[in-house]
């Protein structure tokens, strides 16, 4: 699968008797629950190469098929049969060519913030760092004084420029001056803690029960577009050739997912369901940010325990 500048090319093959088609699975659809695939292309040859428009209008949103995965189905009467693994984009068109930040030492610093100790970056001799980026602390659905408008998917969202300048730009600029590779830890608060409650309702997972952070809601097109817009804005701002606001080199998704009930909550779920949702979130970030920085990496987040079980009783699942 190749996501090019204005189209998506899917190449594959299949064998067997019957009617087959290529199915598109956007993040807001659960591939296991799909009875009749809503977005499909009929296959007439066992080996195929299909090129589709990358951007399509869906329910008032200009959806980017970069976010979709693709699979082969066999047509059924009541239910279509999934006959292949789903496949994400292998190649992603990059808008620009940023140089990679090479690590010069093993030494790093966790959770950098704007304070009087920033000058210690030099004396510490660090080569990497992390920074918490909680998107629900600066993103709004309606404009407020001092906001920056950002349009994605045909919808406009608003970002608190004062927050960005003081809490993110300052440490990221200082890190960029020293060629420190910074990884952003992406966090989503539950609706009750969000600066914009309406945004919180949109991004809080529908099965959230408790905990510090929620798994993002990716069950509707509206929520997916909003979540994707946050990544698009962050990558556009913090992946530039001149590092005008600082640089985010890598992305860490959420917090300690092995303790998901407290740190990335979506209720009590089978491990397979939780993992599938988590991978959707990771993939959405990866596919978007790699357009701006082809060297960017996306990492999973786990607890800091090496020899003992961490978060005992906090990673429950049904079998």
Regions found by a protein language model. Give the residues of each.
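Alpha/beta-hydrolase-fold catalytic nucleophile elbow
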Residues: 254-255, 301
């Amino acid at each position: 699968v190749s996501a090019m500048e204005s189209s998506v090319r899917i190449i594959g093959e299949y064998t067997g008797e019957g009617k087959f088609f290529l199915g598109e699975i956007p993040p807001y659809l659960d591939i296991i629950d799909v009875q009749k695939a809503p977005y499909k292309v009929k296959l007439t040859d066992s080996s195929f190469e299909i090129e589709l428009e990358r951007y399509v209008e869906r329910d008032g949103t200009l959806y980017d098929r970069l976010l979709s995965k693709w699979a082969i189905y066999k047509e059924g009467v009541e239910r279509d049969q999934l006959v292949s693994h789903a496949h994400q984009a292998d190649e992603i068109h990059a808008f620009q060519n940023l140089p990679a930040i090479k690590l010069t030492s093993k030494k790093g610093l966790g959770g950098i913030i704007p304070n009087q100790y920033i000058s210690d970056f030099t004396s510490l001799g660090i080569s990497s760092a992390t920074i918490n980026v909680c998107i629900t602390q600066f993103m709004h659905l309606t404009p407020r004084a001092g906001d920056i408008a950002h349009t994605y998917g045909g919808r406009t969202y608003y970002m608190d420029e004062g927050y960005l300048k003081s809490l993110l730009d300052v440490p990221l600029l200082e890190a960029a001056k020293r060629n420190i590779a910074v990884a952003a830890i992406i966090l989503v608060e539950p609706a009750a803690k969000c600066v914009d409650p309406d945004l919180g309702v949109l991004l809080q997972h529908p099965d959230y029960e408790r905990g510090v952070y929620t798994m993002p809601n990716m069950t509707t097109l509206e929520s997916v577009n909003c979540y994707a817009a946050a990544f698009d804005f962050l990558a556009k701002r913090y992946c530039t050739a001149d590092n005008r606001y600082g640089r985010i080199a890598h992305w860490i998704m959420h917090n300690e997912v092995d303790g998901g009930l407290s740190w990335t909550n979506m209720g009590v779920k089978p491990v397979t369901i939780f993992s599938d949702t988590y991978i959707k979130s990771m993939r959405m970030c990866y596919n978007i940010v790699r357009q701006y920085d082809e060297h960017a990496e996306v990492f999973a987040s786990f607890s800091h325990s090496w020899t003992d079980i961490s978060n005992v009783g906090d990673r429950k699942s049904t079998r």
